[in-house]
């Protein structure tokens, strides 16, 4: 499997650069924090658009589920498999964040504001294994589920070999790191 260099994806540094290591779905907290960072610099501080670049790294835990499209959330009953709150099961998983208030903290909206997202391939494979076991997918091999998950990544999400390496790569490009 070939993985891209993240440098061109991140683009030229901005005045402010923040990396968010997101490990859990956690009510969409990681995506909400990214939105808050954009709002703080662009609106509250009045610096305007383009002064902040963010990178969200979805790795380990359950956060990898945020990278998948709505059809995949439904097909694999991800909210149920993750035992998310009952209200999350009823919510629309708008662009990968079942807890987003509208679409202001969705991956689609954040990428439009200049965010880059990286999904850990190791986490995709681990998540495929967990889904297969949790949902009793005895006729669906783990490798096939992992391939389907990789194919279901949202636009703006780039697959990387390992999230922990992506975090280091982003920090080497002078992004401050925030664990969410």
Which positions does each model-derived feature cover?
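Secreted/extracellular ectodomain signature
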Residues: 1-180
């Amino acid at each position: 499997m070939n993985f891209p260099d993240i440098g061109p994806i991140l683009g030229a540094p901005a005045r402010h650069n923040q990396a968010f290591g997101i490990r859990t779905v956690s009510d969409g907290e990681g995506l909400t924090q990214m939105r808050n960072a954009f709002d703080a610099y662009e609106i509250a501080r009045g610096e305007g658009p383009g002064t902040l670049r963010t990178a969200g790294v979805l790795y380990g835990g359950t956060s990898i589920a945020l990278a998948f499209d709505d059809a995949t959330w439904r097909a694999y009953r991800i909210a149920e498999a993750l035992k998310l709150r009952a209200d999350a099961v009823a919510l629309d998983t708008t662009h990968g964040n079942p807890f987003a208030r509208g679409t202001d903290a969705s991956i689609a909206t954040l990428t439009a504001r200049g965010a880059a997202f990286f999904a850990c391939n190791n986490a995709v494979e681990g998540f495929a294994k967990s889904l297969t076991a949790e949902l009793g997918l005895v006729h669906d091999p783990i490798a096939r589920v992992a391939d389907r998950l990789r194919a279901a990544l949202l636009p703006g999400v780039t697959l990387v070999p390992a999230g922990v390496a992506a975090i280091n790569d982003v920090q080497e490009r002078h992004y401050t790191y925030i664990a969410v």
